[in-house]
Amino acid sequence: MSGESMNFSDVFDSSEDYFVSVNTSYYSVDSEMLLCSLQEVRQFSRLFVPIAYSLICVFGLLGNILVVITFAFYKKARSMTDVYLLNMAIADILFVLTLPFWAVSHATGAWVFSNATCKLLKGIYAINFNCGMLLLTCISMDRYIAIVQATKSFRLRSRTLPRSKIICLVVWGLSVIISSSTFVFNQKYNTQGSDVCEPKYQTVSEPIRWKLLMLGLELLFGFFIPLMFMIFCYTFIVKTLVQAQNSKRHKAIRVIIAVVLVFLACQIPHNMVLLVTAANLGKMNRSCQSEKLIGYTKTVTEVLAFLHCCLNPVLYAFIGQKFRNYFLKILKDLWCVRRKYKSSGFSCAGRYSENISRQTSETADNDNASSFTM
């Protein structure tokens, strides 16, 4: 073999050029190392990602802030599911606030911020993903108790509702623990003449095995185990709804199912690409063309994964009737405050009190249902 041999301890990233081994003749086992340039992938990422991240940041921040404001104005109407959805909105807000940094990094082709910022932003993404999956698991279990275990629902949920804040704190804590490897291994370092913010495992023995181990643990606890819980819960939920033929129950669960499906549709493609990338680590016979394809796919699916941050508020607005009503009330109240007084003569305060009174009356009709999913 001519040329330099590949170091199997290196953990390749799809944005870096590397050497591939190709046969020099059909009958010869000799091969030579050729440089696989991923400049096309980097150029595509430099143009596509900043625009996509900017749009996701604007719409995600606006939508999730409105969700938090809506919950804040109508906090008496919360159920356990509402508390989980509120925490998911907070996680999404924290996440989209990091996107401008990544947009700048892709646009400039280098990580221009500090090493501490690199670790922090990478960690926030991992925590957001794991927290979202665990909260969706909690939502699924809450809906399972409310619908499948209807006879026990009131007793169980009435005991658990006051503890919803503790449950959310546990979820956040587990998310931090699951994502701890992200804070440890991600760092700013120089490669091919520019600084990057990527995982670096060269400080440990057998870095490829370490990367596979960390990736496996994150996927296991942050994706596959929650997914199994959701499949179990929603299988019995759908079975119960089909048997009940209750349109009101169908409306109550519709928004939750939509949120789960959208989240999985956004996250599964990118995680499958990461699995393929991990499976290719250390292989000598990696095709340059296939690596370019993986690079393009990773860029697009990553944007798709981030897109869920601004899709959840849209789902609430178009599917959740009570959320839509509450949101419209807030808009009317804000408009009323701006105008101070309507031509009819009654004040904004009176109108707001009327809205609150109506909201409280509506909530009393169904204390056990999620106010944002009916």
UniProtKB/Swiss-Prot annotation:
Record flagged with keyword NADP: no
Cytoplasmic membrane side: 75-83, 142-159, 239-254, 322-374
Main location class: membrane
Domain of life according to the entry: Eukaryota
GO MF annotation: an example: C-C chemokine binding
Phenotypic consequence of C288 to A/G/R: No loss of calcium flux but loss of chemotaxis in response to CCL20 stimulation. No effect on cell surface expression
InterPro entries: CCR1-9-like, Chemokine_CCR6, Chemokine_rcpt, GPCR_Rhodpsn, GPCR_Rhodpsn_7TM
Glycosylation sites (chain numbering): N7, N23
Transmembrane segments: 48-74, 84-104, 120-141, 160-180, 212-238, 255-279, 304-321
SUPFAM superfamilies linked to this entry: Family A G protein-coupled receptor-like
Membrane topology type: Multi-pass membrane protein
Pfam families, alphabetized: 7tm_1
Impact when changing C168S: No effect on calcium flux and chemotaxis in response to CCL20 stimulation. No effect on cell surface expression
UniProt effect for mutating C233S: No effect on calcium flux and chemotaxis in response to CCL20 stimulation. No effect on cell surface expression
Disulfide bond annotation, renumbered to this chain: C118-C197
Transcription regulation is among the record's keywords: no
Protein family (similarity comment): Belongs to the G-protein coupled receptor 1 family.
Function summary: Receptor for the C-C type chemokine CCL20. Binds to CCL20 and subsequently transduces a signal by increasing the intracellular calcium ion levels. Although CCL20 is its major ligand it can also act as a receptor for non-chemokine ligands such as beta-defensins. Binds to defensin DEFB1 leading to increase in intracellular calcium ions and cAMP levels. Its binding to DEFB1 is essential for the function of DEFB1 in regulating sperm motility and bactericidal activity. Binds to defensins DEFB4 and DEFB4A/B and mediates their chemotactic effects.
Protein name per the record: C-C chemokine receptor type 6
